[in-house]
């Protein structure tokens, strides 16, 4: 009888061991998002980090850089609250890229502490509001609040999800160091929180991956080559610059299961590698906030959704050129409806996809020909944009794409009836030259497959601007740029 009991206990123990082993090797046990212990939310820690970030940046500006704008007092805070918000005159890259990037840090202070997309959004707003009111003696800027909040949310969610692609808590040594370094470079606040919690150096046997490629596919590529920027639309009067570009398509627009906020987005970032042109020359982000599939009877897949957009194009004067800046275009805060549809396969045409978007621009910017106050040579305003993206994938041969952007931005609040001789430019409170601008960007792309990973890339971008000024002569301007390079598809 005792022998039977011993045999039964051994059998149960062996069975339990097998079940445990199976549980440890189940695909779900690989991913951090399936472990309830790792899904805890820390809103107060996120708030402390947001507050601490502002204090740290202010202290650096005040005591290391000795900046005048950082010499705050109780009186300056009261004055900012009493005076209210204005439109400031910082340079294009500061207002329409650096501020959104700063907002991404506020957003990710919450996102990396377990909060959801929508729960993290108020942190971007609160962090920006605190800075505008209390961290500068200059009047708070309404454009900074908008760009930091809405632009920061877009950049923040994209960088949060991109950092998940490289993190792997099962790795050790140099591989682990490289992954943690890249993850922190992509999303600094996530790296900071992983350092605080010890996750950065903790090695795990389960729940160690942060992204499931089978659940949400990701197409990522790196490109490099030569960019020719024409001056005033002249074919042989321009300059060549090397460039580095990153592209990603995250998720499947037609996935009916993984259809949460930003489970589908596209991103493109181009960096100029010469001293004359801006380091960051182009950023295009589009993320799905909400979407629903539409039924069709033709075999075509269709999806209607609400999308957030962030677009940024920047350039400077061409060397030995006319002295005119080719373009500056920003869509820092924008949201609106869109339709994506995919046609059935037709012979060698593996994929034909069409994307159409209509967006309300809450904050946008464009180069101006007249307004030039402090560091600002561009107008700001609101309006709308229409975008059309056509993609023809020919499988093993290559791909053709046509991207078309149309922006209409209205500058409502001008400066024309103010005395510029006596008014403090910090309190000018103007969006720029009153009027409106129509901007068009047409970008055909040809990619030829050289191997399973390498592609030749050829593209042209045509820029057109027609600015109507209420108190000045209207201006039309057009130019183009070409790119020739190689792409590595992961």
Q: Residues of each region from the PLM?
A:
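Membrane-spanning beta-strands of outer-membrane beta-barrel proteins
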Residues: 241, 332-334, 381-383, 437-439, ...
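Bacterial Sec-dependent N-terminal signal peptides
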Residues: 1-23
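N-terminal targeting leaders of membrane proteins
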Residues: 18-97, 103, 107, 111-113, ...
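Transmembrane beta-strands of outer-membrane beta-barrel pores
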Residues: 224-228, 252, 269-275, 308-314, ...
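Small-polar-interrupted transmembrane alpha-helices in polytopic inner-membrane proteins
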Residues: 117-137, 149-153
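Membrane-embedded beta-strands of outer-membrane beta-barrel proteins
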Residues: 244-248, 337-339, 386-388, 442-444, ...
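Outer-membrane beta-barrel "beta-signal"
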Residues: 196, 478-490
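Extracellular loop and loop/strand-boundary signature of outer-membrane beta-barrel proteins
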Residues: 232-234, 320-328, 371-377, 426-433, ...
């Amino acid at each position: 009888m005792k022998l039977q009991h011993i045999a039964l206990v051994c059998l149960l123990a062996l069975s339990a061991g097998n079940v445990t082993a199976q549980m440890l090797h189940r695909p779900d046990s690989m991913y951090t998002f399936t472990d309830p212990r790792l899904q805890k939310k820390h809103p107060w820690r996120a708030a402390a980090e947001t507050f601490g970030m502002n204090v740290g940046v202010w202290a650096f500006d005040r005591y290391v850089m000795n900046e005048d704008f950082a010499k705050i007092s109780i009186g300056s805070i009261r004055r900012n609250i009493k005076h209210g918000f204005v439109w400031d005159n910082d340079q294009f890259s500061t207002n329409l890229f650096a501020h959104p990037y700063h907002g991404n840090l506020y957003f990710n202070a919450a996102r990396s502490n377990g909060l959801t997309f929508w729960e993290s959004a108020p942190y971007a707003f609160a962090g920006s509001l605190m800075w505008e009111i209390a961290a500068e003696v200059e009047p708070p800027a309404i454009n900074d609040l908008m760009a930091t909040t809405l632009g920061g949310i877009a950049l923040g969610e994209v960088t949060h999800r991109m950092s998940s692609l490289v993190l792997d808590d099962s790795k050790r040594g140099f591989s682990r160091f490289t992954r943690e370094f890249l993850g922190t470079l992509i999303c600094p606040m996530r790296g900071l929180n992983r350092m605080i919690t010890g996750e950065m150096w903790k090695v795990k046997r389960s729940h160690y991956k942060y992204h499931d490629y089978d659940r949400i596919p990701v197409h990522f590529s790196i490109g490099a080559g030569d960019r020719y920027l024409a001056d005033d639309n002249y074919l042989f009067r321009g300059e060549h610059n090397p460039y580095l570009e990153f592209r990603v398509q995250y998720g499947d627009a037609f996935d009916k299961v993984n259809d949460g906020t930003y489970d589908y987005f596209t991103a493109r970032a181009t960096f100029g590698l010469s001293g004359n042109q801006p380091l960051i020359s182009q950023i295009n982000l589009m993320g799905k906030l909400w979407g629903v599939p539409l039924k069709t009877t033709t075999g075509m897949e269709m999806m209607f959704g609400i999308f957030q957009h962030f677009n940024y194009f920047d350039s400077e004067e061409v060397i030995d050129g006319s002295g005119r800046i080719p373009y500056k275009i920003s869509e820092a805060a924008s949201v609106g409806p869109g339709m994506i549809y995919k046609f059935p396969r037709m012979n060698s045409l593996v994929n034909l996809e069409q994307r159409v978007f209509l967006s309300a621009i809450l904050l946008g910017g464009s180069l101006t020909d007249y307004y030039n106050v402090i560091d600002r040579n561009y107008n700001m305003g609101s309006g709308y944009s229409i975008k059309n993206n056509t993609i023809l994938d020919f499988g093993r041969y290559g791909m053709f794409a046509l991207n078309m952007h149309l922006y209409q931005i209205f500058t409502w609040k001008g400066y024309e009836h103010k005395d510029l001789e006596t008014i403090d430019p910090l309190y000018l409170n103007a969006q720029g030259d009153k009027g409106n601008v129509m901007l068009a960007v047409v970008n055909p792309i040809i990619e030829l497959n050289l191997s399973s990973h390498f592609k030749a890339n050829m593209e042209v971008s045509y820029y057109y601007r027609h600015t109507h000024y209420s108190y000045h002569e209207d201006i039309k301007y057009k130019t183009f740029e070409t790119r020739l390079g190689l792409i590595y598809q992961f």
